[in-house]
A protein has these predicted regions:
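Acidic, glycine-rich low-complexity/disordered segments
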Residues: 21-26
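A short, structure-level motif marking secondary-structure boundaries and short turns
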Residues: 2, 35-36
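Alpha-helical hydrophobic/aromatic positions enriched in membrane-embedded helices and signal peptides
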Residues: 4, 17-18
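Metalloprotease/metallohydrolase-associated module, dominated by Zn2+-dependent proteases
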Residues: 1-9
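Non-catalytic accessory/interaction domains
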Residues: 8, 13-16, 27-31, 38-477
Length: 477
């Protein structure tokens, strides 16, 4: 169960339930739910009982809906196309569905497609279309609302799945992508902003949008972002865009820009939550790639009276080799909290010296670490700026034996911790130590536990995506 119920499981489950409500209609859904609870009170039920109640209330057949949504995996892909004539009228405004990412399955979707116009430097919604699609395509504007002279002027941006009603990858067209990157922060509806950012991020992950353009857009937009959850997620996306989707040769300039922008925002903001977000992003970027001119700033944060910020900065200094074990131990002695204990373990493991790394790897196999300390030790080893033999090949060789000799909780932490290293196509041997190593492991461990093979396959898939996207943008160097 631990390997099956993950973030994707819950996210898809919530999206599918939300889509079911949209598909049958909110009134029909609640009426069906009332019938369901009334008929089965104090009894045991299954999914079919709920669907029968919803079918009665909505007068829609739902067995095909269930088959398409609950017995298949992967997201649908939705996109839009249209034609603009000489007088600016939009015709053939069409919603398309691809099942390439979900085994060719074409699902029933009910979505909102909205159009937006740039006016006075901001985006205003002009139209909203309620669209149902079951096959490869369906018209978005059957009444021809936009099929009038000048209609295109009200569609600078086309947003698919605006109300986030379905589980799908929503593609922005080229013009909408350009407009979104420039003006997304001006949209006054947080959900729409989140949907647009998700579309842009999926384009980055699929090699369709240059990560550098995405990063610039995020750094420009986050000061105006009023939703902390969106702001924090975008800053995490920036870090991942650099480390996963840009080859090493393209990272330096972006890294410098991220450091300069996040520390500036940290100093300028008057909002405590925003300060924490920008400071964390700054420290994380410093930890990942350094920056001599910012060392004093990070040392200042290491002395902060905010324990979270202080320990993040201390861990960053350790990972860059700017403090030694004695300093980390002194910090630990001055802070008796459990979080300090965990962070100090991670900091010590991240020290880029052979003795510290050898001790950390020995502790991983010592059977003395708690769950949290195992995770912290592996995270420290991966975060280190150490440039020598990382010990990953030996750790991967022990995946199966560790899995079969430990509890599922420890085994999961070990497998995911060991495999959480990066890929850089510009670094000698990096592809072989990631893609090649895991392919070889899978070839020679065909009879390994299915749950373990699944974890390795998922990490291999991520490495293959990283390699594919990095090679796409290396061509533009």
């Amino acid at each position: 169960a631990k390997t099956n119920f993950d973030g994707i499981t819950y996210a898809k489950g919530a999206s599918v339930l939300k889509q079911l409500v949209a598909w049958v209609g909110e009134d029909a859904f609640y009426e069906g739910a009332r019938r369901y609870f009334a008929e089965h009170q104090f009894g045991a039920t299954n999914l079919q009982d709920l669907l029968v109640a919803l079918e009665g209330a909505s007068r829609q057949e739902l067995s095909s809906w269930k088959n398409a949504w609950l017995e298949t995996s992967g997201p649908s892909t939705l996109s839009a196309s249209w034609t603009t004539d000489a007088v600016g009228a939009i015709t053939d405004f069409t919603l398309h569905q691809s099942g390439e990412a979900c085994g060719g399955v074409l699902r029933p979707h009910r979505v909102t497609v909205s159009t937006w116009r740039v006016a006075a430097g901001a985006l205003d919604r002009t139209h909203s279309f309620d669209v149902r699609i079951e096959g490869e395509q369906t018209p978005i504007d059957p009444d021809g609302v936009l099929a009038v002279p000048g209609g295109a002027a009200s569609a600078d941006l086309v947003v698919i799945n605006d109300d986030d009603l379905t589980y799908a990858i929503s593609r922005l067209d080229e013009r909408s992508t350009d407009v979104a990157l420039t003006y997304v922060a001006s949209i006054d509806v947080a959900l729409t902003r989140a949907v647009i950012w998700a579309s842009l991020w999926n384009a980055v992950r699929d090699g369709l949008l240059d990560p550098r353009r995405f990063i610039v857009a995020v750094l420009t937009a986050v000061p105006a972002e009023t939703e902390p959850a969106i702001r924090d997620r975008l800053l995490l996306f920036v870090a991942e865009a650099i480390s996963s989707f840009l080859p090493g040769g393209l990272r330096t300039d972006v890294h410098d820009q991220v450091l300069a922008t996040t520390i500036r925002l940290s100093r300028e903001t008057q909002d405590a939550d925003a300060w924490r977000s920008y400071t964390r992003a700054f420290i994380a970027e410093f930890a990942a790639r350094g920056g001599d001119e910012y060392e004093a700033t990070v040392r200042g944060f290491a002395a902060s009276d905010n324990p979270d910020i202080a320990w993040r900065a201390r861990r960053a200094l350790a990972a860059r080799g700017l403090v030694d074990a004695g300093v980390v131990e002194a910090w630990r002695s001055a802070d008796g909290s459990g979080e300090a204990a965990r962070m100090s373990v991670e900091a010590l493991a991240s020290l880029p010296i052979e003795e510290a790394r050898s001790h950390a790897w020995d502790s991983v196999y010592s059977e003395t670490l708690s769950n949290d300390f195992l995770t912290a030790t592996l995270a420290g080893l991966q975060a280190s700026s150490w440039d020598g033999e990382a010990g990953i090949e030996a750790a991967v060789d022990r995946l199966r034996s560790y899995w079969e000799s430990h509890t599922i909780g420890m085994a999961l932490r070990y497998a995911n911790g060991v495999l959480a290293y990066g890929l850089d196509i510009d670094r000698d041997g990096s592809v072989e130590r990631s893609v090649g190593l895991l392919r070889s492991w899978l070839d020679t461990n065909g009879d390994a536990p299915a749950q373990l093979r699944r974890i390795v396959i998922e990490h291999l898939d991520a490495f293959e995506r990283d390699e594919r996207v990095q090679r796409r943008w290396k061509q533009d160097q």
